[in-house]
């Protein structure tokens, strides 16, 4: 165990030692993720999505939940973008870490903060709601775990692809409002996948309700899917679309 821990410590670069900025960023992820999960789960509870896991939600209920998640994601990502990047999501954090945009230590701290925040939000909601049913992400009736996995991969891929295009690509013309626009793809994906998998796209968003209710049925789908889709989107965008120079300038005398 000691050797394993030493290898783990050695795997972190020296410039990853937490500083004041890192601590602030982790605290921002804690607060922002708490608010996002609290808003999303409470909206789902208020909208009446408390049927049996796997039951299809009426379109009005699904739309209400999607709008709440879209607004919360857009506003909170914008609010925290200048502090922590406004990840709110382990899939975003891991995807950016794999592509080298954040350090490994910061990624670990972010994910820990996100999971803690989600858990606290859902436990508090159970207390504040008087024990109302906490909706958990579940596969729709007739949807196999593998089908759900692929759906979560695709939904998370689209989320991260849009993030790269609007925020990380230096050629983007909407970087200033990119975080706010991110909420639109969250809402669209929630409508598209809500009755298939619940459209998690976010392991932290799924973790809190599962912990609060003790319902871990097919919970792995909501980890593996997003954690595959996020890095895949980064790889595809950076490999095919994130071109540093559109063309090389001609030298004098060349035609």
From Swiss-Prot:
Chain ranges for the short sequence motif NPA 2 as given in the UniProt record: 202-204
Subcellular location: Vacuole membrane
Protein topology in the membrane: Multi-pass membrane protein
Keyword Membrane (UniProt): yes
GO cellular component assignments: membrane; vacuolar membrane
Molecular function per GO: water channel activity
Segments crossing the lipid bilayer: 25-45, 61-81, 108-128, 148-168, 176-196, 223-243
Main location: membrane
Coiled-coil blocks: none
Motif NPA 1: where in chain: 89-91
GO BP: any one term: water transport
SUPFAM superfamilies recorded: Aquaporin-like
Alphabetical UniProt keywords: Membrane, Repeat, Transmembrane, Transmembrane helix, Transport, Vacuole
Domain-related comment: Aquaporins contain two tandem repeats each containing three membrane-spanning domains and a pore-forming loop with the signature motif Asn-Pro-Ala (NPA).
Function: Aquaporins facilitate the transport of water and small neutral solutes across cell membranes.
Family named by the database record: Belongs to the MIP/aquaporin (TC 1.A.8) family. TIP (TC 1.A.8.10) subfamily.
Protein name according to UniProt: Aquaporin TIP4-1
Annotated organism of origin: Zea mays
